[in-house]
A protein has these predicted regions:
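C-terminal catalytic core of tyrosine-transesterase DNA break-rejoin enzymes
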Residues: 23, 27-34, 98, 102, ...
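Catalytic-site neighborhood detector that most strongly recognizes the C-terminal catalytic loop/helix
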Residues: 52-60, 72, 95, 143-166
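Hydrophobic (often cysteine-bearing) scaffold residues that line and stabilize catalytic clefts
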Residues: 14-18, 67, 71, 99, ...
């Protein structure tokens, strides 16, 4: 079913910005609002890095997201559409970032109403990576979750950036 959804997204003829937002979400598995509000100034596309500042993160901690080559390519495709604006996923018609409902509505148009949500990428990624035996610390770091072990959370400031690139 997941493969069918990914194929449907690739073939969808919707707005380029909304389509790009749908396409990039499975690669970064950040919170929907975080990816939707991605700023050009947060990106280092040559290094494949996206840095979210602490003030916009749910947990109040800056978050570095490694970008795979596919994610970088998707972002670069948007430069002609939104490169002159602050936000990558810009709604030209309304002169603001894409709305919270943009991807949800797109998923509904694709026939996935009630079957999949924009936040679902995080659940799917976590499940698939755990099933494949990836280290839980790396997965939780990618999801920007605080460590449930308070002592480890206090002392361990590792980002596992290279491991998360896998």
């Amino acid at each position: 079913k997941l493969g069918e959804l990914l194929k449907a997204i690739e073939q969808w003829n919707g707005t380029p910005t909304v389509r790009a937002l749908l396409r990039i979400s499975p690669y970064v598995f950040t919170r929907p609002s975080e990816v939707r509000l991605m700023k050009w100034s947060e990106l280092d596309l040559d290094a494949g890095i996206w840095t979210k500042q602490a003030d916009v993160m749910k947990n109040g901690i800056a978050h570095v997201v490694p970008l795979c080559t596919q994610a970088v390519a998707i972002i670069k495709e948007l430069q002609p559409f939104s490169g002159r604006f602050e936000y990558v996923f810009w709604n030209v018609a309304y002169r603001q970032p894409l709305s919270e409902g943009a991807t949800r509505k797109a998923l509904e148009r694709l026939g996935y109403k009630g079957q999949f949500s924009p936040h679902g990428w995080r659940h799917t990624a976590s499940t698939l990576l755990h099933e494949q035996g990836f280290n839980s610390m790396w997965i939780e770091a990618q999801l920007a979750h605080k460590d449930s072990n308070e002592i480890r959370d206090t002392y361990n400031h590792a980002t596992y950036l290279e491991q998360r690139r896998e």
